[in-house]
Amino acid sequence: MAKEKPILNVAFIGHVDAGKSTTVGRLLLDGGAIDPQLIVRLRKEAEEKGKAGFEFAYVMDGLKEERERGVTIDVAHKKFPTAKYEVTIVDCPGHRDFIKNMITGASQADAAILVVNVDDAKSGIQPQTREHVFLSRTLGISQLAVAINKMDTVNFSEADYNEMKKMLGDQLLKMVGFNPANITFVPVASLHGDNVFKKSDRTPWYNGPTLAEVIDAFQPPEKPTTLPLRLPIQDVYSITGVGTVPVGRVETGIIKPGDKVIFEPAGAVGEIKTVEMHHEQLPSAEPGDNIGFNVRGVGKKDIKRGDVLGHTTNPPTVAADFTAQIVVLQHPSVMTVGYTPVFHAHTAQIACTFMELQKKLNPATGEVLEENPDFLKAGDAAIVKLMPTKPLVMESVKEIPQLGRFAIRDMGMTVAAGMAIQVTAKNK
């Protein structure tokens, strides 16, 4: 059997009206991942609903409600092959109330494609576009390319394309720490397929790669196998004749039968008997693998979702408190010392209290604007000290980035996102 192509997870980010879903649908169609007949059927459905041009978007917008509203709600995953990779698309929603999905979606991505509407050069960069790029950067995505879409609406004008490219570079990418010189920009018309998989003859002035070629130029992710083992528990099952079977995704390190392990903050210690993925026993599992495993010496009641597994020689850090850099995405009032919202970190959901507001930062450059601010409001970035109200595993992003990022939820919305820059371990 031919060796399988490596998998590359690519997030599609940007404002809701930039044509992300259409770009993705076009990649899937031209990449041979969907039947052309499906597009014909969806085109008819779109036209009947007065949404002509939405047929490609419908491929990703599988949920009926999304089709009627024309927005992408949940994070959808679809695959297509390129010359080099098996690409899994993480189509991230654009609407503000779905930023939580964006946070959980983007954190699974190896690279991101920012889709923008060429016409935004006239109206300015959309706030959502800024937020998505900033979040991707905060969530550790270092590879980015830009698709400047809807080129057909400006008659494939090179001047309009260059204006948009310059505006993005000067007003957004540089500010969040991307070097525009290292980013590939592609002029596309996704609805018609120009420069998506196939070179367009309508952009004779452009001699760069197509969007599919840009994806092939991304570097494959390096699996963090040399970092300490960290496996956040998603669920715990008790299987007759087998025993306790926790399941979760290996974030860092390697797990294999015979390993002596500890679950934190539960403190339960055991030995790995077997490791399974897709009902097959594995000699070992590595980062990215979703596994079930059997542990000797640990009962179902001893551990729960939100616990993190590590080796007894290097146990996960239970935080007494931690200092974090956060960005406030939205908040109806202000955040002050004493505020205690729920933190979503790996698989845990634990309320944490704001103990100190240490510095307010310029969200785009990171420079300090104010020491010890009295409050934080929407749009602010800050360094804060936090204390979990119950035991929580948190690692510093410098040491184990996969376990140092979090979203902060309150009142049914994601109010902030951030990363732990320093963690004080709880004394046992």
UniProtKB/Swiss-Prot annotation:
InterPro entries on file: EFTu-like_2 (IPR004161), EFTU-type (IPR029459), G_TR_CS (IPR031157), GTP-eEF1A_C (IPR054696), P-loop_NTPase (IPR027417), Small_GTP-bd (IPR005225), T_Tr_GTP-bd_dom (IPR000795), TRAFAC_GTPase_members (IPR050100)
Any one GO MF annotation of this record: GTPase activity
Annotated spans, G3: 91-94
Reaction catalyzed: GTP + H2O = GDP + phosphate + H(+)
Pfam families membership: GTP-eEF1A_C (PF22594), GTP_EFTU (PF00009), GTP_EFTU_D2 (PF03144), GTP_EFTU_D4 (PF14578)
Entry binding sites for Mg(2+): S21
Naturally occurring in which organism (per UniProt): Methanococcus maripaludis (strain C6 / ATCC BAA-1332)
Stated role: GTP hydrolase that promotes the GTP-dependent binding of aminoacyl-tRNA to the A-site of ribosomes during protein biosynthesis.
Biological classification of the source: Archaea, Methanobacteriati, Methanobacteriota, Methanomada group, Methanococci
Occurrences of domain tr-type G (ranges): 5-225
Region (G2) location: 70-74
Keyword terms of this UniProt record: Cytoplasm, Elongation factor, GTP-binding, Hydrolase, Magnesium, Metal-binding, Nucleotide-binding, Protein biosynthesis
Broad class of enzyme this protein falls into: hydrolase
Sites where the protein binds GTP: 14-21, 91-95, 149-152
Protein name as annotated: Elongation factor 1-alpha
CDD domains: EF1_alpha (cd01883), EF1_alpha_II (cd03693), EF1_alpha_III (cd03705)
Membrane-spanning residues: none
Principal cellular location given in the protein's record: cytoplasm
Gene: tuf
